[in-house]
Design a protein with these regions (language model features):
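C-terminal catalytic lobe of FAD-dependent flavoproteins
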Residues: 87-171
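Active-site substrate-recognition segment that forms the wall
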Residues: 1-116
Length: 171
């Protein structure tokens, strides 16, 4: 984007890592058919059935920059998921993975037009999959100059992409 991002992190984004697990349900067990979301001792845990007979369990949040899953994260996710869905202890463990989600200093996403031809929509942290459709719709409307459309106006001023910027984009 005209060199604005070269060698810099002007938006103050940080990687928030999350461990996630995959299990395989044995054929003799009835698989769960709905997403299960819960809190165990103030920790969020979710169990997601997949069409291939596997289950995804997630996810932790950490900012330690380790590349792989943490033993503590794997242990905590398994323990919490089994407390919520006890039959999981009979599943086959397939893998533990880690991914990075972009976070902002105040954990609010960046969503806004910063100049003609440049709309920023990022920093959704652990809610990215939930807010992706909203971010895409509003981002497209901002880029096309049609926001707000259909009489639906949501105040997105708190999501100003430049609120933490270390540099100003060229105008």
């Amino acid at each position: 984007v005209d060199g604005w991002f070269e060698g810099a992190n002007p938006l103050a984004l940080r990687p928030v890592l999350g461990d996630m697990l995959r299990l395989r349900v044995p054929e003799e067990l009835a698989p769960i058919t709905r997403v299960v979301r819960a809190f165990v001792e103030d920790r969020p845990v979710y169990v997601i059935p997949r069409t291939d007979g596997t289950i995804a369990i997630g996810a932790t949040s950490r900012e330690d920059n380790r590349k792989g899953p943490s033993v503590d994260g794997v242990h905590t996710l398994l323990r919490d998921a089994i407390r919520v869905v006890p039959g999981l202890e009979d599943c086959e463990f397939i893998e533990a993975i880690v991914g990075a989600r972009p976070g902002t200093p105040d954990d609010l996403p960046y969503l806004g037009k910063v100049r003609d031809g440049l709309v920023i929509s990022t920093g959704y942290f652990r809610h990215g999959i939930l807010l992706s459709a909203f971010g895409a719709k509003v981002g497209a409307q901002l880029g096309l100059g049609t926001y707000p459309a259909n009489g639906l106006e949501i105040d997105i001023s708190a999501c100003d992409p430049l609120r933490h910027a270390r540099y100003s984009p060229p105008r």
